[in-house]
Amino acid sequence: MTNAQPTELISLPSELLCHLFTYLPQRQLITEIPLVCRRFNTILNDDKFWSRRIRTEQKVRLPDCELKHPEYEPKKSFYAMHRQRDRWRAWETQTVITAPGHSATVDSVMLFENNNKQFCLSGSRDRTIRLWSIENARNGEDTEQNPWTVAKDDTAHSGWIWNMAQESTSTNFYTTSWDSTVKSWHITDNGALQNLNSVNVGSAAQCISCSGNENEVVCTTFAKRVAVIDSRTFQVVADHKLHKRAVIALAVQGDKIFTSGEDRLMMMVDRRNFSKPVLFEYSPTAYKSCLSLQCNQLLTSTSDGKVKLYDANNFNVLQTYSVGSYTRQSFLEHGAHLIMARSLKRNYTFSIYSPGTRSQQWCASHELAAEPAKFDYSPSSRTLAIGNGDSSILFCLPASAPDQEN
């Protein structure tokens, strides 16, 4: 090429530009580079560019049910995988904080943000709810000037607290307990925990979700019941007992209510017709200990140490992989499968697997010192919280802040 033919980046062949783009910071590639010129914008908004990177760089094959979901975008999917791999490069690269405070097993943790601040709610077998400030835990020791627990209710329930769920549009949240009640709560402007309502569902209440229809909360019980509660009147307005034993896992999306029980049945029931299941599966060897629903996919953990991914539209099995002797919890996150499992040596680890139908392990923790009960993960803050059997909570914080991601 002579001096009479100046080289300009914009004049390079598209194939070469696509290759060069893979070396740029991913956030910049999505938010800034498309604004440089029309040609860059065209290349970086082409679904084929991102789909190819998902297959070749991430080595992920996504199921058809996700690809056909109306909210699926290859660019967002690739970036979600990139963020997860960056977050979990190695377990040792993060900051792990052990937070004492409860006096019994912490069966429920729930991360959320309010006014650009990070918080965690925890519920325990000591019948107490605590509200934790993640910023204060990150900033230093738990002192009177820097309290980690910013609010608590020592008499929240008269039995063990099993689960929590929060409304997406407010600071209202819900709790279930061994005392057979479901309670609604509000975090006031000054940070206090205010009990709003309570309803008795007849037996120990287990799972809870408010991700279905507006103004409805769905819960399950140990006495085979799945109940729908009107959040305005806080009364049970519909229920079914299609399971034969305790209902221990729940996932809800719109009118679709997915449950699994100790009877080894997994089913989907339409909210508009509780008389019979639309879909069901019976497993002769193991029950599903957890359900996680996203983009037409249902990720399940099993009592015999497996993780199974289903097409939520028809219960077709998309993949199965083994993670130990017992899978405590599975979490289907944009860009990854998050798994808590017990090994054959009866030690627990937290693992991250690639999404899609050919999952590979990306990262794993060391053997956890305390037996975990439940975890939650916040994709916006990239924070992991683990409630433990020794009454502590682990807050696992990323090495870099979200605004420092590449």
UniProtKB/Swiss-Prot annotation:
The keyword Cytoplasm is assigned to this record: no
GO CC terms, sorted: perikaryon; presynapse
Cellular localization per UniProt: Perikaryon
Biological role stated in the UniProt entry: Plays a role in mechanosensory transduction (touch sensitivity), touch receptor neuron development and synapse formation. Regulates expression of the protein snb-1 and the distribution of synaptic vesicles at synapses to promote synaptic transmission at the neuromuscular junctions of GABAergic motor neurons.
Protein name: F-box/WD repeat-containing protein mec-15
Family annotation (SUPFAM superfamilies): F-box domain, WD40 repeat-like
Entry comment describing in which tissues the protein is expressed: Expressed in several neurons in the head, tail and ventral cord, but absent in touch receptor neurons in adults. Expressed in GABAergic and cholinergic motor neurons.
Deleted gene: phenotype: Temperature-sensitive phenotype with defective touch receptor neuron synaptic transmission conferring variable degrees of touch insensitivity amongst individual animals. Touch receptor neurons and GABAergic motor neurons have mis-localized presynaptic vesicles as indicated by aberrant expression of the protein snb-1 and distorted cell bodies. Reduced rate of inhibitory postsynaptic currents at the neuromuscular junctions of GABAergic motor neurons. No effects on cholinergic synaptic transmission or snb-1 distribution in cholinergic motor neurons.
Any Pfam family the entry gives: WD40
Keyword entries, A-Z: Repeat, WD repeat
Quaternary structure and partners: May interact with the SCF ubiquitin ligase complex component skr-1.
Gene3D superfamilies to which the protein is assigned, alphabetical: 1.20.1280.50, YVTN repeat-like/Quinoprotein amine dehydrogenase (2.130.10.10)
SMART domains: FBOX, WD40
WD repeat ranges per the UniProt record: 101-142, 156-195, 242-279, 281-320, 365-406
Keyword Oxidoreductase: no
InterPro entries: F-box-like_dom_sf, F-box_dom, WD40/YVTN_repeat-like_dom_sf, WD40_repeat_dom_sf, WD40_rpt
Domain F-box: 6-53
